[in-house]
C-alpha cells in the first residue's frame, strides 16, 4: 500500500499491467456455453472520438467485465470502420486532395505539407494509400483513448473493415448472396447525392425541412382547355411522363384516360388515375416526372410509364433533350436548360413559362420536407443508374415477415426500441442498394466480359475464385484473362464501384469471429451474446446485420442488443460531429480521471438520452477517492492474513446486520447486470457504500482498534474485510482502475479475474455455531431487525444534536434516553456498545413506550 493513496497515474500503470498479464485475453479453449461474445461497434475512423463514444462504449465494457467475473470467457474484440465516405472526406480535407481515377499512379507521390486552396487531383491508388496512412494514425489515437478509458478489450482481436481479412469476408458474403439470388444488378431509379456523386440507400436518408415555392402551370387538354398543375419542381417539366389524379376526384374523372400536352415542350402525356394522388394537395392533379421523388418512382413503376431522364449525376440537366421532345421550338427551349443546376434550371423554366403565358397566378411559398443524404448538404436527386442490390424484404412480403419475426426473437434493452426496428422493416419500399460510386472501400468483386465491339455483357459477370479473395478488379485481372485485355474488345472491364460501408459493417460478427477463416473460433463465439450500439442506427447497422445473418445462417447474429441513448448538450440537443457541439474526451479523462468519466457514463440507462454533466464526473472522482480512503482504513487493522474475509469470524450483531444488507445489495446489483441495467447496479452499490462509510465505519471504528484476540474485535475486522472484498468486486465493472489499485494492496491477482460476489457469501453457511448461539441467546429476533439502520438512526440524532448546538462531533453526550417498544429496545441493546463509542455517550437509559424508537440527547 502506498504511503499516500492517489488516483494520479493509475490508468497508465494498470493499463500496462493488464496488457502484460493478458488479463483480458480471450481463452479460446473453452466451449461455446462458457463464452460471452460481444459484437463491438467499430468506430468510424474519420477524425476524433467524442464523449458520446465514451458514454456508450463504457456501458458494454461494464457488462463484459461483469460476465468475465461471472466466469465466462469474454470474447471482446475491437474493430475500426475505416472505409467509406467519412474517411474519404477526412482525407480530402486533411491533405487538400481529390481523387481522379483517370490519372495514373505516382509511386513517389507525397501529399502537400499544407492543404492547397484548390484540391490537388491524384490517382485512385494514391488516394487509397493516403486513406490507409491517415486511418492508421487515427486508429492509434483511438486505441490510446480506449486503453485510457479502461476498455477490457482483447487487443489481439483487432480488425479493420478495410483489411485483407475483412475485404475477403465481405466479398465472399456478397458472392454467396449472388449465388443464392439474394444479390442482383439492375438499372433502376436510384437515390443520388450530386455532391458525392454516389448512390444512397434508403437507410441513409434524412428528412429536412426547407422553404420551397409552388408554381401553378398550365397543361392543355385535347379540347384546348387548360389543366392546372401545381409543382415545386418546374425544372422537371421536360421529364414529365404523365399526369395523375385520384380516381374518385370528380373534377378530373372526365379526363382520365385522355391525353394532355405539356407547356413549353409540347409533349403528349397520358392522364392516369392512382389512389395515392391527393385531391387536397395543390390543384389535385400532379405531374409524374422521372424522377422528382419516391412517389414518382412508385407511380412510374405501377403505371408502367416510360422514362425521360433529364438530371445528370453532377446535378445538372443533361446536354441532350429526353425522348419526346422533338419539335424545333421544344428542342430550343430545352437547350436553354442544358447544363444548368436544378436551382438555375428552375428559374429558367419559370421565366419561359411566364413568357409563354402558361404560368398562372403568383408563386406560393411553402415549407416542404426534402430528402437528403445524411452526410450531404444538397437535396437528393433520383436518377436511373446501374447498381447492385441485396434483397431486404422491401419488395418481398415473405422475407419482410421473416425479418420482423427475427426482431421479435431478439432481446432488446430497452424493450421499447423493438418497435423502431419493426417500423423500419414494415416501411421498406425497395431493396438495399449496396454499390457506391466512391474510391476507398471494399471493391465489388466482379468483372464483365466485353464483346467484339467493346460493349460489356452485364448479364454474365465474371466472378473470382474463392481462394483469390480479396480481389480488386480495378488492378487484378480475372482468371483466364491477361491485364493487357482490360477495357479491350473481347477482353474485360472491372466493376468500378465499391460496397456501401454498411455492407461490410453488417458482417462484424463474421469478421470478428473469423467466419470462413478460423472455423474453430467462429464456432466458439457465434451467434454472439451482445450487440451494443446507438439507437439511431437500428435501421442501418442492426437491421443489415440481422438481414445478412438470416440469409447466410438462418439465425440471429446475437441474442441481445443493448442500445445507448444520445448525449445532450446544455441546450438539450444531441451531441454530434456534424453539429459541431461535441466534447473531446481525453481532456476529461485527464482532468477527472477515467473512473470518474465512467461513473458519469454508467449513470445513463440503456436507451435513455443523458446530459453531458461534468458535475457527475466530480461526484465520480470523489467516489473513487473515497474507495481508496475506505480501503486504507480497513487495511490499518492488520495484514491480509489477519484480514481474511471469513463469515465464521463475524459474531457481532451489528457486523452481521451490515453484511446482511450488503448481501441484498449484491443480489440487486447482480440482477441489474443480468438485465443490462448497469445503472441500477451502480446506484445500489454506491448508496450502500456511502452508508457504509458514513455510518458503519464510524460505529465500528473504536471496536476495530481493540485487541485482536477479542472476539468482538475479530468480528469487526472480518466484517470490514468481507465488506471491502465485496465492494471492490461490485464496483470493479464500473470503476476498473481504482478497484484494481485498492485490490492490489491486499489481494493476489486482478480484481477483474476475481469471482463476482454472491449474497450467500455474506449470510452463510459459514456463520459459526457460536455466532448463532449468541444471536439466539439475545432473544432479539435479529433476523427481522435492521440493526445497522437502527444504530445509524440513533447516531444521526446524536450528530444532529451536536451540530445544532455547534459542538464538535467528539463532544460527549451526558445521557442518551431511548423510548420505544420492548423489541426495539432489545435490538438497540445489541448495538449499544458501538453507538455509545461512536457518539461519545456516557450513559444510556431506556423506557418502554408504545411508540417508534425515539432518542433524547442531553449533551455534556
From Swiss-Prot:
<dbReference type="InterPro" id="IPR013155">
    <property type="entry name" value="M/V/L/I-tRNA-synth_anticd-bd"/>
</dbReference>
<keyword id="KW-0547">Nucleotide-binding</keyword>
<feature type="region of interest" description="Disordered">
    <location>
        <begin position="469"/>
        <end position="491"/>
    </location>
</feature>
<dbReference type="GO" id="GO:0005829">
    <property type="term" value="C:cytosol"/>
</dbReference>
<dbReference type="InterPro" id="IPR009008">
    <property type="entry name" value="Val/Leu/Ile-tRNA-synth_edit"/>
</dbReference>
<feature type="short sequence motif" description="'HIGH' region">
    <location>
        <begin position="43"/>
        <end position="53"/>
    </location>
</feature>
<comment type="similarity">
    <text>Belongs to the class-I aminoacyl-tRNA synthetase family. ValS type 2 subfamily.</text>
</comment>
<feature type="short sequence motif" description="'KMSKS' region">
    <location>
        <begin position="574"/>
        <end position="578"/>
    </location>
</feature>
<dbReference type="GO" id="GO:0004832">
    <property type="term" value="F:valine-tRNA ligase activity"/>
</dbReference>
<dbReference type="InterPro" id="IPR048044">
    <property type="entry name" value="Valyl-tRNA_ligase_actino"/>
</dbReference>
<dbReference type="InterPro" id="IPR001412">
    <property type="entry name" value="aa-tRNA-synth_I_CS"/>
</dbReference>
<dbReference type="InterPro" id="IPR022874">
    <property type="entry name" value="Valine-tRNA_ligase_type_2"/>
</dbReference>
<keyword id="KW-0030">Aminoacyl-tRNA synthetase</keyword>
<feature type="binding site">
    <location>
        <position position="577"/>
    </location>
    <ligand>
        <name>ATP</name>
    </ligand>
</feature>
<dbReference type="Pfam" id="PF00133">
    <property type="entry name" value="tRNA-synt_1"/>
</dbReference>
<dbReference type="InterPro" id="IPR014729">
    <property type="entry name" value="Rossmann-like_a/b/a_fold"/>
</dbReference>
<dbReference type="GO" id="GO:0006438">
    <property type="term" value="P:valyl-tRNA aminoacylation"/>
</dbReference>
<keyword id="KW-0067">ATP-binding</keyword>
<comment type="function">
    <text>Catalyzes the attachment of valine to tRNA(Val). As ValRS can inadvertently accommodate and process structurally similar amino acids such as threonine, to avoid such errors, it has a 'posttransfer' editing activity that hydrolyzes mischarged Thr-tRNA(Val) in a tRNA-dependent manner.</text>
</comment>
<dbReference type="GO" id="GO:0002161">
    <property type="term" value="F:aminoacyl-tRNA deacylase activity"/>
</dbReference>
<dbReference type="InterPro" id="IPR009080">
    <property type="entry name" value="tRNAsynth_Ia_anticodon-bd"/>
</dbReference>
<dbReference type="InterPro" id="IPR002300">
    <property type="entry name" value="aa-tRNA-synth_Ia"/>
</dbReference>
<keyword id="KW-0963">Cytoplasm</keyword>
<keyword id="KW-0436">Ligase</keyword>
<dbReference type="InterPro" id="IPR033705">
    <property type="entry name" value="Anticodon_Ia_Val"/>
</dbReference>
<protein>
    <recommendedName>
        <fullName>Valine--tRNA ligase</fullName>
        <ecNumber>6.1.1.9</ecNumber>
    </recommendedName>
</protein>
<comment type="subunit">
    <text>Monomer.</text>
</comment>
<dbReference type="GO" id="GO:0005524">
    <property type="term" value="F:ATP binding"/>
</dbReference>
<dbReference type="InterPro" id="IPR002303">
    <property type="entry name" value="Valyl-tRNA_ligase"/>
</dbReference>
<keyword id="KW-0648">Protein biosynthesis</keyword>
<dbReference type="Pfam" id="PF08264">
    <property type="entry name" value="Anticodon_1"/>
</dbReference>
